[in-house]
From Swiss-Prot:
It comes from the Bacteria. Pfam families: Ribosomal_L9_C, Ribosomal_L9_N. This is Large ribosomal subunit protein bL9. GO terms for biological process: translation. GO terms for cellular component: cytosolic large ribosomal subunit. Keywords: Ribonucleoprotein, Ribosomal protein, RNA-binding, rRNA-binding. Binds to the 23S rRNA. One of its GO terms (molecular function) is structural constituent of ribosome.
Length: 153
């Protein structure tokens, strides 16, 4: 039987601060509590932790609903056009289209800022044409964007 503790700080393997978790007694007694990462759960702390978790779930549900609305908006706008310099043949790009380029195009067309690190380009975009990229908006909410790469000029 484990020991119930309330985390005082975020612990990668257990959860976020304020979370009620059950761990092995030795782990709690010898590591988590002495390091100041957790405290032994008392009835008052358990009640407070449950209240915080309910609040966190409520806030997360609101963020998820907002993210789903944003996804719908982004996907409804159709193609996002990117203009890039091309070589002699008219198809081969100088360089590639990057996550930053996609983020800037989305911001200018949709007015929605997406962190470039949340944009996934499956294969390097080195030619003009139509491509699909994914933008992670919130945890597991991912928008699929269609990108039209055209020659600049």
């Amino acid at each position: 039987m484990g020991t119930k503790i309330v985390l005082k700080k975020d612990v990668d393997t257990l959860g976020k601060a304020g979370t009620l978790v059950e761990v092995a007694p030795g782990y709690a007694r010898n590591y988590l509590i002495p390091q100041g990462l957790a405290v032994k759960a008392t009835p008052g702390l358990v009640k407070e932790a449950e209240f915080r978790q309910a609040k966190r779930r409520e806030i997360e549900a609101k963020h998820r609903a907002d993210a789903l609305e944003t996804k719908k908006t982004l996907e409804a706008l159709g193609f996002y056009e990117v203009f890039a310099p091309v070589g002699e043949d008219g198809n081969q790009l100088f360089g590639t289209v990057t996550n930053q380029d996609v983020a800037e195009v989305v911001a200018s067309k949709a007015g929605i800022t997406i962190d470039r690190r949340e944009i996934t380009i499956e294969e390097p975009i080195k030619r003009t044409g139509v491509y699909t990229v994914k933008a992670r908006i919130f945890q597991d909410v991912v928008a699929t964007l269609r990108l039209q790469v055209n020659a600049a000029g």
